[in-house]
Amino acid sequence: QQTVQFNIDNAEEYIEKSVLNSIDPYNVYNARADLYVTTDYKILPGMDYQNPDYTSSILSAYTSLLTNHEAISAIAEQFNMEERYMRELVGVWGDSSTRLLSISINAASEEDADAILDAVIARMNGLYDTIESTVGHHSITLLSRTSSITVSTDLRDQQQNTRDNLTSLQNQMTDLQAQHDLLEQNIQKADQ
């Protein structure tokens, strides 16, 4: 019973505090930035030895450093939010074939999505010197920045699964309590 109650408490807390869970899945605001990463890599025709292309490593470094505990926690603090709830809103990925670093933010309002995106980009700019000195020389150019509103059936399904999970846990708790009560009655009858 204690484990089930613990799970119920966690599910209720998540439903209450999660920003992603409170977003209307039919009105998801998204802010996105696509950034182009260039390095000094050049193909040397006719040469057996080619200089290494660090683009993939640079993209991986940004992706890792923008989504690690320290980064997400610092951004979450700016918005008075717990790290685990901010982490649900922020997506960062790199594609070495296109040399793009993409940052995507989902939020309940356009203002929130844009503000969180600004914070992630500021964090990215603060990482430049570290990545430059440890991975390699590069430059970053903002190719596009967009804000949109969309429907997310995945989010709708996730929210429904969360509610269904809570209902299932509550039903399980009711069943356990009924079994406990029946056992108590049987013990009392046996004692008489």
Task: Name each model feature, range by range.
Residues Q1-L20, Y26-D191:
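Soluble oligomerization/assembly scaffold segments of membrane-associated complexes
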